[in-house]
């Protein structure tokens, strides 16, 4: 699957690269799991509601979430 990043999400990802390698590793594990298992798997996948239908969230940790949408062959 091809990864497509929102500009703000990419900036957050780059920030985690320098600030907290543990969270960056968790984000990478979640992305790999999404590519393998779609909307099932680790991180307690939950569909979002209201204006975010079609989007899902997974827990990075107690405070942070990874928000994503799967379309065709893109995450």
Task: Walk through the language-model features, giving the residues of each.
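Basic, Lys/Arg-enriched alpha-helical interface segments
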Residues: 1-63, 70-75
């Amino acid at each position: 699957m091809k990864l497509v990043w929102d500009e703000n999400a990419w900036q957050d990802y780059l920030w985690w690269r320098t600030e907290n390698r543990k969270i960056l590793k968790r984000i990478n594990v979640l992305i790999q799991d999404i590519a393998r298992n779609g909307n099932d798997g680790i991180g307690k996948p939950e569909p979002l509601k209201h204006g975010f239908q079609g989007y899902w969230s997974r827990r990075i940790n107690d405070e942070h979430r990874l928000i994503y949408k799967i379309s065709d062959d893109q995450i």
